[in-house]
Design a protein with these regions (language model features):
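Domain-level detector for secreted/extracellular nuclease and nuclease-toxin modules, and
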Residues: 5-6, 13-265
């Protein structure tokens, strides 16, 4: 792990800082994963310049060549898909570099070796319904460096909660991603940026929306926040079609501050 050189840090900071700019608009190639078929809006247009959309069977990734991680990952979960995922028990576990990305733009397996970080799924393997979609979830384009105490415990609890809630309510849109806040950004081997936090936004049609954000630390600090607050902090609006009132509301979501030993799914 290394601190980034000043010039590189300035470049990354410029690309990741939340700027007062017009949202980036681009037609998505995989609308079924998004609420109302509309992809998240990048409030900071600089993020879009280095971004590539990767469509998969059960999720879509917007990958950044600056961070060499996803900017976000979006999923549409249904009662049917979660039931299928729960009945599929042949998890793949074959992490791999994504061949759809140029080598210079993507993470490699070697970047994570002896790094001290887990390879944390943004779209969890536990949401995948079959062999092909599960293999896709182990692409490093769907992965961020995540502290093991978070990844294996309370973050896994959150993922399971979202699946359970979907089984109860029948339909949910989920957008997950890393946040890079503050002036000091570290990287694995000077290549893969280490997020300061990871977040998950949830929208249940007819019920409302909100988000969780957790610091990427051994003792994670969890917050339940509004979609508006998430957008302010990350520069990403996960659900552009929602009303301003819906985005401003802080939901009555449970917290996941208690870390219990669970296998990351």
């Amino acid at each position: 792990m290394s601190n980034l050189p000043g010039r590189l840090l300035a470049t990354i900071g410029a690309a990741l800082a939340v700027a007062a700019s017009q949202p980036a608009a681009a037609a998505t190639g995989c609308p079924t994963h998004f609420a109302d078929g509309v992809e998240p809006t990048l409030i900071n247009t600089k993020l879009a310049r280095s971004a590539t959309e990767l469509c998969n069977r059960r999720f879509v990734v917007l990958h950044s060549a600056v961070t060499r991680t996803p900017l976000y990952v979006a999923e549409h979960l249904t009662r049917t898909s979660v039931a299928a995922a729960r009945s599929y028990d042949q998890r793949d576990n074959r992490f791999h570099a994504d061949p759809r990305l140029r080598p210079a733009d993507r993470a490699e397996l070697a970047n994570y070796v002896r790094s001290g970080f887990d390879r944390g799924h943004m779209a969890p393997s536990g949401d995948m319904t079959d062999e092909e979609s599960d293999y896709e979830s182990f692409s490093l384009a769907n992965i961020v460096p995540q502290v093991g105490a978070l990844n294996r415990n309370s973050w896994a609890d959150l993922e399971n909660y979202v699946r359970t809630l979907t089984m109860k309510l029948g339909n949910a849109y989920v957008v997950t991603g890393p946040a890079y806040e503050g002036k000091t950004i570290k990287a694995l081997n000077g290549r893969v940026l280490i997020p300061t936090s990871t977040w998950k936004a949830l929208y249940v049609p007819g019920q409302g929306a909100g988000a969780w954000i957790a610091t990427n630390t051994a003792t994670p600090r969890w917050q339940v926040i509004s979609i508006a607050e998430l957008t302010r902090r990350t520069g990403i609006d996960p659900f552009p079609r929602l009303t301003a009132a819906t985005k401003a509301k802080v939901p009555a979501f449970p917290s996941f501050g208690r870390d219990r030993a669970k296998r990351d799914r």
